[in-house]
Amino acid sequence: LMNNYSSDRLEFELEKTGEESGFSIYTPGISLPAGDYNISFSYSSGAGSDYETRIENKAGEVFYSGNAGDTGKISLDKTETELIVKTDGDAVATKIMVASDGEIFNDKYFLAALVFLGLAYLLYIKFLGKGDDSDANIHLFLIALGLFSSYPLYTFYLQYGHDLLFHLFRIDGIADGLQSGQFPVRLYGNDLNGYGYGVSMFYPELFLYVPALLRLIGISQVTAYKTLLVAANIATAFIAYYSVKGVSKSKFAGLIGAAIYTLGVWRAINLYGRGALGEALSMIFFPMIILGVYHILFGDKNKWYILALACVFMFQSHIIGTFISALLIVVMLLINIKSLCKDGRIFGLVKAGIFALALCLWYIIPFISGYFSMDLVIKAADETANFQNGAAIPLQLFNVFSDWRGASQSLSRGLQDEIPLSMGVGATIALIACAIYFIRNKRNGDRIGDHKFNLQMFIMTLILLFMSTYLFPWDYLRDNFAPARF
């Protein structure tokens, strides 16, 4: 618990859960990072002073042994994830107090350094940076936007998320792997009683090295995770701004787009409700992929590296997000095949593909090797899964009021206990504004070529929204179109 909540003093109620070799075993199993701790116990009034008490891990390694009523110290060379309290069978232990002998984490120094660096950066862009005042003000706005979208993190704890514990487990697994000499980390050696767990072979973890490295310099798990999320929010604001600005050639459009996207409902649900860290990280780079495709087809063909880097970062964030992005890229390229074949633009696409593939081989090769050499549950997945039953009800796309703590339920339950699947007010207004804009331009006889790419993005958005609902024939495609099963 100290490992999770950065406390320096904790008191536990003890409850007998079993017996072993003349010793009574008590809960809870305590998680402590490396360090020195003072230990004290409380016993029932009938307990004497000559009963032995131990603290040991599951492997039987004893860290403390003393008589009832004594206080003592334990020293841990590494993080112990489950320490167990045992006493002589005749003694009745009721409480244990664990207090750190000195500071456990370096959080306050780290946070002070972040504040100092943040203020230094703000002063630099305001008074010493290149460009006009509007650029400095835009940077200030984007930073403020990222910090505002992080407000659920401004507590001393973490909000519960569906997948939160798994991602915290991944971060500490990487930290343990680095500490044991692995790089890149492929196996969480301390998991499964020391047998190890190969999560890193199947989950991309590039960005999780940031909080893992913070863990290695003494930052608590909570602060390390929050640091990653705040950085993700600020990065989302900046990338969304420059992506929208790059396509629209408008700073104002970039700011509006950044605000709508950064404060989007589904992005917030991924971060704070579902704890879907991979999907949340992948959403940083969706706008960058759109900008990259734009430059390949219509913009500066020499900026092919934008698409390449966007694909690399997407791949290193979320495999499913990568697959969806790849499908959309292919669709856009096919729609604009004539533009792609002009002026040597296709060579930019080839360079982007080769560059992205080369930078991802360090992950792709172990992934393919592990997938085809291991007996995995996913290979026995039910091909008759009812996708349509889990699709959204159209009303949900525009629903403003819902419980963020819900889950994705079947259609038979209607909106009961449903997680928010709404676009949000901002995105809905933007969608309506785009529709009015294109209709008005059509009536005024404006050339479609002036905003061809934007119109294509708008139409694709409508199609994807429709495909996310139960109105789309997912079941029919599953039963009659083989590729849809994949």
Task: State where each predicted segment sits.
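Active-site lumenal/periplasmic loops and adjacent helix-entry segments of GT-C-fold
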Residues: 146-285, 292, 313-314, 319-320
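Membrane-interface transmembrane helices that cradle and orient dolichyl/undecaprenyl
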Residues: 289-305, 314
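Start-transfer (signal-anchor) and selected internal transmembrane alpha helices
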Residues: 104-152
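Membrane-helix boundary/interfacial segments in multi-pass membrane proteins
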Residues: 160-165, 170, 175, 193-195, ...
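Membrane-interface helix-loop-helix junctions at transmembrane boundaries of multi-pass membrane enzymes
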Residues: 130-133, 252, 339-349, 432-474
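Periplasmic/ER-lumenal interhelical loops and adjacent helix-loop junctions
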Residues: 348, 353-440, 453
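Transmembrane-embedded, aromatic-rich helix segments that form part
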Residues: 305-308, 321-336, 367
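Glycan-recognition and processing domains
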Residues: 1-36, 47, 56-57, 97-99, ...
